[in-house]
């Protein structure tokens, strides 16, 4: 390994506590998709401190941003994520389920590390470009809303990936490997059911249960699974079951 590459790697080692502190801070303040305001501010501040030119509010998304360094080709994009999941609050350093806030947000698959690791990689490439004097551009893309928000799709639609020679990312896992592959596309659909409320004991025949309709649709979807190809997935959440009183027809 030549001295320039050693210097680039030394940048990561020298600033390890800095990158780790970002990961820890995002773990401690888990924010849901497209609401990662503290995380976005943390990253844009870090990018500016590291000498990147920062752009905020990409594609009109408040928590999407980029930090670039260098000029010319190759142009290397490095993608970072940082959103959390609802209901997965977890104490750090504990190997058993132990929430900080019961029912609160948490990082179920390491997005606190994902963004910080990508930032470290971008900093290493920046150091290599600066030390070698070679042409090239590195761009760190802050990609919010990975857990269902699909911000990358909007960023692609707006042409943010045009001009890149390569785009790289990583994901925390139990193995250390380099891999390529594809992922399923994702479509989100929100269904709303409306019924007619009625007293379930005294006037049930005049009620129209929206909850019954939800359950019938869900059962139909379960039967549909048998006839779908192996690469398809269906997931669901009932966000409003209509009410909490069993003696009322849920509307």
Where are the regions that the model predicts?
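Acidic/His- and Gly-rich active-site-bordering loop/insert found
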Residues: 2-107, 112, 116-136
């Amino acid at each position: 390994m030549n001295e320039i590459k050693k210097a680039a790697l030394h940048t990561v080692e020298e600033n390890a506590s800095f990158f780790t502190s970002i990961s820890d801070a995002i773990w401690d303040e888990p924010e849901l998709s497209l609401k990662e305001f503290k995380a976005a501010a943390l990253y844009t501040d870090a990018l500016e401190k590291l000498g990147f030119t920062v752009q905020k509010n990409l594609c009109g998304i408040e928590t999407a941003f980029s930090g670039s360094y260098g000029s010319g080709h190759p142009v290397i994009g490095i993608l970072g994520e940082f959103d959390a999941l609802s209901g997965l609050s977890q104490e750090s350093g504990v190997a058993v389920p132990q929430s900080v806030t019961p029912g609160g947000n948490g990082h179920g698959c390491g997005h606190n590390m994902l963004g910080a690791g990508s930032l470290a990689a971008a900093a290493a490439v920046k150091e290599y470009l600066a030390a070698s004097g070679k042409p090239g551009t590195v761009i760190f893309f802050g990609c919010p809303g990975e857990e269902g928000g699909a911000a990358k799709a909007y960023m692609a639609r707006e042409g943010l990936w045009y001009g890149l020679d390569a785009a790289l990312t990583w994901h925390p896992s139990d193995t250390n490997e380099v891999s390529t592959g594809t992922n399923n596309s994702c479509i989100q659909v929100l269904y709303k059911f409306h019924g007619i409320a009625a007293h379930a004991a005294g006037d049930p025949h005049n009620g129209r249960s929206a909850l019954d309709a939800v359950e019938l649709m869900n059962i139909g979807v379960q039967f549909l699974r048998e006839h779908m190809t192996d690469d398809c997935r269906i997931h669901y959440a009932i966000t409003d079951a209509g009410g909490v009183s069993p003696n009322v027809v849920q509307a």
